[in-house]
Amino acid sequence: MEKWRFNSMLSKEELEHQCGLSKSLKCTGSIGNTNGGEDLAINNMIRGWVDSDNSSNIDHLVGVSNIRSLISDDTFLVRDSNGKNYSIYFDIENQIFEIEIEGDRSFLSELESFFSSYLNLNYSYPNDGSKSDNHYYDRSMYDTQYSWNNYITSCIENYLRSEIHIDSYISSSSDNYSKSYISNYVCSGGGLNSTDSESFSIQTSANGSTFDMIGKFKNFDISPKYSHLWVQCENCYGLNYKKFFRLKLHICEQCGYHLKMSSSERIEILIDPGTWDAMDEDMVSVDPIEFHSEEEPYKDRIDSYQKKTGLTEAVQTGIGQLNGISIAIGVMDFQFMGGSMGSVVGEKITRLIEYATNGFLPLIIVCASGGARMQEGSLSLMQMAKISSASYDYQSNKKLFYVSILTSPTTGGVTASFGMLGDIIIAEPNAYIAFAGKRVIEQTLNKTVPDGSQEAEYLFQKGLFDLIVPRNLLKGVLSELFQLHGFFPLNKNFIK
């Protein structure tokens, strides 16, 4: 169960915006209607909440920022402008709605009244059963199970339809709210400084169906408080909802940028379920040169990364099936000491290549590395020669098929050795691929490195790669490449 905390105040425009969502529920009165037929009851309700000093500010709960957040089994901690605290618990699967209130208990009845009027404005009847224009009364008001279920269902439907974008129009007078929505709920410090605010802008599409952040913010960071909910794009600084981010293969919804993935996630999307067999999982570094930095000993640093990632080293190797085709695969993990290549990484990859050579298996190595590991000195540099030697026997002597996949970043000794030795070299979109980094080149040669000159698209034009393949297409492309080179599925059900 997750707990979300909100502390905000919505203006009339924001509440009009959230009421505008009721179009999907066939609301008879639309706030944006220009024919003069706006719903007077809604306007009165807005005016009453904005002007009243004693109101409970229900809009804190049901405003635009929260309407997208009604996910199963969540607790909302709400504070109104009067300092009252409310704990609202939703469990959609088990159909539970509970409210814990500090102080005035009238909040519950006010909440029910609002939800009822919001839910079915086109089905309103007075107590005597005759039709009326009184939108505060609803036939489902006292059927709370019906009200909650329908309201929450509509919220989730809108949420999924927009894929966590903010729907509908935002008026010019609510620009300040638009900015504060991001800063209050997601960003650290509860707001942006003056410099950031000047470069911040919000645009909506012609039909008002998307909410985009334009501009880049160097100091626009997600606070640790909300890091479990959102992932910020490194390219456009847009926010991606974490629950759906893995299903989207860590591709930014705003700009399509490919963010970093862990080795386990890459194995999951490439290898058929139930076919993964890891190799050499117990192989760990023994600190061969007894490297000690001023910050912490090398072995302590290794231990901390092992606890952080759940891995023993910066690469996972093993055997599996890709669409029924048996393969040997190694996947580097940048989260483990920057994917640096030490003696253990070199030994695991060498053993993997030798196993593939003896078993006549196609080979895939997914590269994500900052290069050789400086804490192991020349031993890490020797891994380049050792892996290249094993690769030569695999490719030149045995005539087997090796596919190298370069992800961001692939630099240093990995680029200079097995990363660029594949029979087919595939790069991910926007991947940063280089031998020496931009800063190192500029400081060494005193020359400016052009922007984008070390990205996959530019290098592809220069002939360094064979393909640039997005993640969602990668498994299918690899399967076709293997079949083209004579490797077919063991299971006939995979053969089309």
UniProtKB/Swiss-Prot annotation:
It holds the Pfam family Carboxyl_trans. It is an enzyme of class 2 (transferase). Binds 1 zinc ion per subunit. InterPro entries: AcCoA_carboxyl_beta (IPR034733), Acetyl_CoA_COase_Trfase_b_su (IPR000438), ClpP/crotonase-like_dom_sf (IPR029045), COA_CT_N (IPR011762). It is found in: Plastid, Chloroplast stroma. Keywords: ATP-binding, Chloroplast, Fatty acid biosynthesis, Fatty acid metabolism, Lipid biosynthesis, Lipid metabolism, Metal-binding, Nucleotide-binding, Plastid, Transferase, Zinc, Zinc-finger. The keyword Metal-binding applies. GO terms for molecular function: acetyl-CoA carboxylase activity; ATP binding; carboxyl- or carbamoyltransferase activity; zinc ion binding. GO terms for biological process: fatty acid biosynthetic process; malonyl-CoA biosynthetic process. Residues 229-496 form the CoA carboxyltransferase N-terminal domain. Its EC number is 2.1.3.15. A zinc finger (C4-type) spans 233-255. Signal peptide: none annotated. Pathway: Lipid metabolism; malonyl-CoA biosynthesis; malonyl-CoA from acetyl-CoA: step 1/1. The keyword Transferase applies. Zn(2+) binds at C233, C236, C252, C255. It catalyses: N(6)-carboxybiotinyl-L-lysyl-[protein] + acetyl-CoA = N(6)-biotinyl-L-lysyl-[protein] + malonyl-CoA. HAMAP family: AcetylCoA_CT_beta. Acetyl-CoA carboxylase is a heterohexamer composed of biotin carboxyl carrier protein, biotin carboxylase and 2 subunits each of ACCase subunit alpha and ACCase plastid-coded subunit beta (accD). Component of the acetyl coenzyme A carboxylase (ACC) complex. Biotin carboxylase (BC) catalyzes the carboxylation of biotin on its carrier protein (BCCP) and then the CO(2) group is transferred by the transcarboxylase to acetyl-CoA to form malonyl-CoA. Belongs to the AccD/PCCB family. NCBIfam families: accD (TIGR00515). This is Acetyl-coenzyme A carboxylase carboxyl transferase subunit beta, chloroplastic. It comes from Ranunculus macranthus.
